[in-house]
Amino acid sequence: MKLKTIMSKCEFMIGATHIKSLPDFSIPEIAIAGRSNVGKSSLINAITNNKKNAKTSSKPGCTKQINFYLINKDFMVLVDLPGYGYSKADKTTINNYLCLMEYYLLNSRNLLKVILLIDAKVGFKEIDLDFINWLELHQIHYQLVLTKIDKIKKEMLDVNVNYIKNLNLDFIMYPIISTSSQCKQGIEELIYEIAQCIKK
């Protein structure tokens, strides 16, 4: 199967809002996580080559559920997690979907890794490091992907990459991938890394 077609057939299956609604497809899952408004929906649309798959918004915290997308029938499931950080939702709603996300990450039998998005223009925030430390604590494998690199200079991009390389991390999966959903930069590399993870 050609690299460009691996993720091309994407079907939204369910938006889980509570633990009992979490599905079990019994096939590999890759979760996408990140701070609110980091560009998760745009990245999903870029790697599936369809702008309509995931709804995008300029307002942070719009995803209040865990969205499951079936990729190429039974190849894998792409899991869109709610953004952490600032949200216009009320505190009860925020707490509910963060608890749901935590439960999913700790209990999914099919999760292979988390793709953690970092806004390259903003850089690493304390809340990003808190989430990384949480993943490390629970021995959950993750891969870092920098987004919106078309909006920064290469020098700033290098600062972000070198920063994380200098941390003592045990469960990070390399390489760190730099992407732009708008310019399609790094998208094929990310698809390749996802495919390699599924094949292992």
Curated annotation (Swiss-Prot):
Signal peptide: none annotated. PROSITE patterns: G_ENGB. The keyword Isomerase does not apply. Its cofactor is Mg(2+). GTP binds at residues 34-41, 61-65, 80-83, 147-150, 179-181. The keyword Cell cycle applies. Keywords: Cell cycle, Cell division, GTP-binding, Magnesium, Metal-binding, Nucleotide-binding, Septation. Residues 26-200 form the EngB-type G domain. Mg(2+) binds at residues 41, 63. It comes from the Bacteria. It holds the Pfam family MMR_HSR1. InterPro entries: G_ENGB_dom, GTP-bd, GTP-bd_ribosome_bio_YsxC, P-loop_NTPase, Small_GTP-bd. GO terms for biological process: division septum assembly. NCBIfam families: GTPase_YsxC, small_GTP. Belongs to the TRAFAC class TrmE-Era-EngA-EngB-Septin-like GTPase superfamily. EngB GTPase family. This is Probable GTP-binding protein EngB. It comes from Ehrlichia chaffeensis (strain ATCC CRL-10679 / Arkansas).
